[in-house]
């Protein structure tokens, strides 16, 4: 067999851009809080679609004409789920709710700016999300029924990311950071108390992070006693756990590349 020499990168390959683009790409994957529904976002040929599988039933597409695509440049996710249905960050800049089972999507917010990370409260009454407009990012709140306008919960930082509810619905954690840092260079983990009556945050405190320390992925334990997060200090990454009752803090795991 005669071999022909060609410059690097110019030989024929069975892996073409068309073949790569035609494949299915999985993005958001999550369960509903009661564990009865598996939800995922996939795209094929650049077209996003939402699928739901309930129990042993076959998966069904529930996109129904929406384009699930958050418009925040650094990401944040397009989907959130409650026991009742799916919250969708749509390319138009609106949040939608699609119930499990019959029913069309319902718009919850006006078409304004771009958003991501729809995060329903444990009781299903509220929805946290990230919002950006004309270079201004913030953490916002909307009622899950869409009957009143969204409100600003936190602002002032250049970027917001990964909001999380305490199981009681009385506290919220999130990460934020400022220019010129990237989130893996330096960011802050914030914790605040949420007052549902006034729809405001109080007792806001920085738990970890700085211009030199990166933090991320805040997660409350199911019983609400602990808050865990990732922290990157110098060459090592850590899983940090805070006891919210006693204030004790410990490093659960100290290793490398946890943030990778």
Regions found by a protein language model. Name each.
Residues 1-13, 138:
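Blade/loop signatures of beta-propeller domains
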Residues 14-21, 60-70, 104-110, 149-154, ...:
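A short beta-strand motif characteristic of beta-propeller blades
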Residues 14-51, 71-78:
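Beta-strand-rich domains and repeat architectures in extracellular enzymes and scaffolds
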Residues 33-34, 81-83, 122-123, 167-168, ...:
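Residue-level detector of Asp-centered blade-edge/turn motifs that repeat once per structural unit
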Residues 41-51, 67-73, 87-96, 110-115, ...:
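A flexible loop/linker signature enriched in serine peptidases of the S9 family
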Residues 54-57, 99-103, 143-147, 194-197, ...:
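Short loop/turn segments that connect beta-strands within beta-propeller blades
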